[in-house]
């Protein structure tokens, strides 16, 4: 149900949407809180990985994936006695030790290089990935409503980046 308000001498304005059941009021905010409390059960877990798993070196790309699908995720739950249908789509933010990449692609192992980063210095590097799930919900088959608050998952992995060294070899020659 839409809630309207008209200040004295003013125009009518929609101020909220609510659901009524047994004389109890459930607001859109209440429904969004219920969705946020439950969404982690229904969306794929992050299993972030990067390749090479060992032996990463400077000036060569490190290829990564979130471990999630880019497909939308749908689920139904009951909140305050209402059947709530939720549809969400993921997007990702990768933080490669201060270098940020925003994408709608989940990445993958080589040869999928859409999520990659080339480090220019050696050391232990923190890689953080945040999945943002945005979408909409529908209460008892009524009109679809955008989820106003963002639903996030985050994880991080550490990668040691070394320096590649060259070694000259001359098979069959006494001195190179």
Please identify what each model-predicted range represents:
Residues 1-176:
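Extracellular/lumenal mature domains of secreted and surface-exposed proteins
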């Amino acid at each position: 149900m839409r809630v309207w308000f008209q200040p004295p001498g003013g125009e009518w304005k929609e101020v909220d949407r609510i659901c009524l059941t047994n004389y109890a009021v459930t607001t859109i905010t209440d429904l969004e809180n219920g969705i946020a409390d439950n969404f982690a059960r229904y969306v794929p877990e992050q299993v972030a990985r990067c390749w090479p798993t060992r032996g990463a070196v400077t000036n060569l790309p490190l290829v990564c994936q979130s471990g999630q699908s880019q497909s939308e995720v749908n689920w139904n739950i009951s909140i305050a006695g209402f059947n709530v249908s939720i549809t969400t789509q993921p997007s990702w933010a990768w933080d490669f030790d201060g270098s940020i990449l925003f994408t709608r692609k989940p990445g993958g192992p080589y040869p999928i290089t859409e999520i990659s980063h080339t480090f220019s210095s050696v050391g232990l590097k923190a890689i953080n990935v945040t999945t943002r799930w945005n979408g909409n919900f529908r209460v008892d088959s009524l009109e679809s409503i955008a989820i106003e608050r963002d639903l996030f998952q985050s994880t991080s992995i550490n990668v040691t980046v070394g320096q590649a060294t060259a070694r000259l070899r001359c098979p069959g020659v006494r001195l190179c």
